[in-house]
Amino acid sequence: MKRSKIIVLLLSVVLCLPGCGKKTDNAEMQQFLKQEGMQLQASGDYTGAIAKYEEALKLADMKVAAEEIDIAYYKASAQYRSGDLAGAIDTYSAILAVKENENSYLGRGLLYVAAKDAQKAEADLNKVLKETKNPLIQGIIYNAVNETQKAKECFEKAKKAEEADAIFYLANIYEKQGDHNYAMILLEEYIESGKANAEGYLSVGRHYFDAGAYEDALTLIRQGISLGESGVLKSLMQEEIACYEKLADFTSAREKAEAYLEKYPDDTLIQREYEFLKSR
């Protein structure tokens, strides 16, 4: 599992901007723009999505409401996924300037980790550690700053409290430590919990793929795709193509490559793969 993908999973985004009660027409247009942004984000067009979210947020007047916060969540997520760490950090700083809260300090602290700004990351994350009693949050913080043993202890405690995400984070730790077999056991447990996200399906699917169990891998990859989570959708679709190729189902592989290129037309690797598949 790549560290950047784990950071994506750790982030919880909240943003508030100044505003005052909005008119019904503005509310309807705001919702429309939000939906457009979500569709663009799901397709991997983060720049377009950010533009839609910003347009929607401009329709707010002088009072922050739940809808503005939700839109801003998507905006910050798109900023992070587009590689705009500075923009995502500014988003968190904006909410913290209005109202301090644990989630925003956590999110900004994790972004500082991703930006390799250890001093600022420590300041934000220590504020959360002093306040939170949640072992999952504690584990997330320790994991982010590479205090692996403390993270493992917190995740074990969270796992006992039936926090399903703790299983995934534990699997990540064991995998990084080279214990791939136990990591796989944990990932399977995570899938069986019924609370797995797309990243979990991708990770387990890749394990099965590497073991040569292509049918099982394909089943898990397709389940992950069905969740529609934009963060790993591109990787899931790539794995789906690879599974069909290994199963010698070149017709399905070609069809999936076509669908992939409709979403990600600039991927030269899959373009070359598609040309190969057309000859099979």
Model feature map: region roles:
Residues 16-19:
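C-terminal motif of bacterial Sec signal peptides marking the signal peptidase cleavage site
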Residues 31-32, 65-66, 70, 103, ...:
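Start-of-helix register in tetratricopeptide repeats
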Residues 35, 67-70, 74, 81, ...:
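Canonical tetratricopeptide repeat
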Residues 42-43, 81, 114-115, 144-145, ...:
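Register position in tetratricopeptide repeats
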Residues 61, 99-100, 129-133, 160-163, ...:
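Short coil turns that delineate tetratricopeptide repeat
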